[in-house]
């Protein structure tokens, strides 16, 4: 079999099914990545969302016996919102990161990979494949870097010459020995804009990420957000794009190649106050198609409360008092009390004190006391 010709056939076919870039890499172990992951583990930089077995993350042979190569794919996504609604006093809005715009990208990339699998099986009935997107064992970034999709930027994203870092990544391990592509040389140079602007200092020189400090991770946690990060969330409901929007390689990059990825402006830049009391059914109907809904509504509601505090949105005080008094979830009651302390206003202190009289949760009581402290500081 002429595997170079097969590779060219696969490249040509990929363009007909909506794959923006494709690359090929050997399936040899990722030894350099292994050392980096061990270091991240030792430094406690991992988020907990990753595959815990470092061997599986770095050795494709453990995932597919007889693995010879890996096919990496990239799909470009939009970076600019058309007809974005305005956020104004009385109608404050939050924002979902670009990776949550449109249909859940996991579904979109799996569709492309399944089509690619079917094409290869038709050509080679005895082929073995294993595909994955984002939540698989392998590092999408390491595979894409090896396959020549792009280089690994200081913002810990794959940066492509064609689309910047606004790309979704997926890969397919196979026992077919495709000729590999060459990696792309790092083009970040001496630029450190992403590192300098990161709101929490999560990006570290050398392309390392302290995941537990990253706002993209913090917005997905379900508990009380540490107070040191609350003011840094801004109006982010899910995820963070700061290290991408500041990147010079992303200047002018905005691609609308895939209808499934087109965002609904009202969904990705939603009014904050209605989020506080949205029902499970309405949440699922409205946001269920987005990747940003995967953790459920509670983290997004907590972040909406923090965004209202960020804006010091006085019109939201009655709604926040309602959450503090009546919401069954301690995280939302406590976060609302803290937010009320940040916003301030007539009657807020009395509302917090009244709620404290019937509150039994120790963490919520701590947040209520903190809210009162913040109010007292305003009077000093």
Swiss-Prot record:
Q: Where is the signal peptide?
A: none
GO biological process terms on file: queuosine biosynthetic process; tRNA modification
* UniProt binding sites for [4Fe-4S] cluster 1: 188, 191, 194, 247
Top enzyme class: oxidoreductase
- List localization entries: Cytoplasm
Q: What InterPro entries is this protein classified in?
A: 4Fe4S_Fe-S-bd, 4Fe4S_Fe_S_CS, ARM-like, ARM-type_fold, PBS_lyase_HEAT, QueG, QueG_DUF1730
Keywords, sorted A to Z: 4Fe-4S, Cytoplasm, Iron, Iron-sulfur, Metal-binding, Oxidoreductase, Queuosine biosynthesis, Repeat, tRNA processing
Instruction: Output the Pfam families linked to this UniProt entry.
Output: Fer4_16, HEAT_2, QueG_DUF1730
* 4Fe-4S ferredoxin-type domain ranges (all copies): 179-208, 226-258
Return the similarity comment: Belongs to the QueG family.
Q: Write down what this protein is called.
A: Epoxyqueuosine reductase
């Amino acid at each position: 079999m002429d595997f170079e010709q097969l590779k060219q056939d696969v490249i040509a076919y990929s363009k007909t099914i909506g794959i923006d870039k494709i690359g090929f890499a050997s399936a040899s172990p990722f030894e350099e990545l292994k050392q980096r992951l061990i270091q991240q583990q030792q430094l406690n930089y991992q988020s907990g969302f990753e595959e815990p077995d470092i061997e599986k993350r770095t050795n494709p042979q453990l995932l597919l016996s007889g693995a010879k190569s890996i096919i990496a794919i990239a799909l470009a996504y939009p970076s600019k919102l058309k007809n974005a609604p305005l956020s104004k006093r009385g109608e404050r809005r939050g924002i979902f990161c670009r990776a949550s715009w449109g249909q859940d990208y996991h579904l979109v990339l799996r569709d492309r990979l399944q089509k690619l699998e079917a094409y290869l099986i038709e050509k080679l009935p005895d082929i073995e494949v294993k595909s994955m997107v984002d939540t698989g064992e392998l590092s999408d970034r390491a595979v894409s870097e090896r396959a020549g999709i792009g280089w690994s930027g200081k913002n810990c994203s794959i940066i492509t010459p064609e689309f910047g870092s606004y790309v979704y990544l997926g890969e397919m391990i196979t026992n077919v020995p495709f000729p590999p592509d060459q990696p792309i040389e790092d083009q970040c140079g001496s630029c450190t804009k992403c590192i300098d602007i990161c709101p929490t200092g999560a990006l570290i020189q050398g392309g390392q990420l302290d995941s537990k400090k990253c706002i993209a991770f913090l917005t997905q946690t379900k508990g009380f957000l540490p107070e040191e990060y609350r003011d840094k969330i801004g109006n982010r409901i899910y995820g963070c794009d700061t290290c991408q929007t500041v990147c010079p390689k992303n200047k002018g990059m905005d691609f609308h190649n895939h209808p499934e990825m087109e965002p609904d402006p009202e969904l990705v830049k939603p009014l904050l106050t209605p989020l506080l009391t949205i029902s499970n059914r309405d949440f699922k109907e409205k946001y269920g198609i987005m990747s940003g809904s995967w953790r459920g509504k509670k983290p997004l509601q907590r972040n909406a409360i923090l965004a209202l505090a960020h804006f010091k949105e006085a019109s939201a005080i009655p709604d926040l008092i309602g959450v503090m008094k009546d919401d069954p979830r301690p995280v939302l009651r406590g976060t609302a009390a803290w937010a009320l302390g940040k916003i301030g206003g007539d009657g807020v202190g009395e509302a917090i004190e009244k709620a404290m009289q019937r509150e039994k949760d120790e963490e919520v009581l701590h947040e209520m006391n903190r809210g009162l402290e913040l109010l007292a500081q305003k009077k000093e």
